[in-house]
C-alpha cells in the first residue's frame, strides 16, 4: 500500500502522510531527509480510520481534510481471507469497481480534523454513490475530485 496522500501544515513544519496499508495518517517533520512510516521521528497522527485514507489537504487554519478510498472496508476485511482477493489482479470495469469500492449514498466521503489537537471537526457525506479521489480546500469551500464527476463538487466549510 504505502503513502497515498500528502499535506503540509500551514506553518510548513509538519508533513502529513496518509498510509493505505496501516489505515492511518502519519505526522513527520517536513525537514526530515529520509522517512519511513512508523520510523524515527514519525508519529501516528490519526489511527483507526473508518476507510482507507487517500488524498490529504490542509487549509490555512490547520484543518486536515482526508478523502477515503475503498470506504467499504468492512466488505474488504470480511472477504480478505477468501480466494477472491488472493487471485491474479485483473482489470475491472468502472461498474465493477464502483460496486466493490464505491461509497454508498450518505456515507462519509471525506472528513476534516484539527491538526492542533486531532479532534474531528466535520464529516462530509456522499450525495450519491461514488468515491472521492482528491480534496482541496480553497477559502471557505472544499472541492472534491471524483473519477466519475462531470463537475467538481464542493462543500462550504
What kind of region is each of these model predictions?
Residues 50-124:
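Loop/turn-rich, solvent-exposed surfaces of beta-rich toroidal or solenoidal domains
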Amino acid at each position: 500500500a504505502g503513502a497515498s496522500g500528502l499535506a503540509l501544515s500551514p506553518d510548513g513544519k509538519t508533513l502529513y502522510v496518509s498510509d493505505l496499508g496501516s489505515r492511518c495518517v502519519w505526522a513527520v517533520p517536513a525537514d526530515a531527509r529520509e522517512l519511513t512510516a512508523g520510523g524515527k521521528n514519525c508519529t501516528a497522527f490519526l489511527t483507526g480510520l473508518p476507510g482507507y485514507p487517500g488524498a490529504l489537504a490542509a487549509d490555512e487554519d490547520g484543518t486536515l481534510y482526508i478523502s477515503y478510498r475503498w470506504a467499504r472496508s468492512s466488505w474488504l476485511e470480511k472477504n480478505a481471507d477468501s480466494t477472491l482477493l488472493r487471485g491474479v489482479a485483473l482489470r475491472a470495469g468502472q461498474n465493477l469497481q464502483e460496486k466493490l469500492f464505491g461509497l454508498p449514498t450518505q456515507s462519509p466521503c471525506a472528513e476534516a480534523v484539527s491538526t492542533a489537537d486531532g479532534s474531528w471537526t466535520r464529516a462530509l457525506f456522499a450525495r450519491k454513490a461514488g468515491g472521492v479521489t482528491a480534496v482541496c480546500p480553497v477559502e471557505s469551500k472544499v472541492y472534491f475530485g471524483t473519477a466519475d464527476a462531470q463537475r467538481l463538487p464542493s462543500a462550504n466549510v
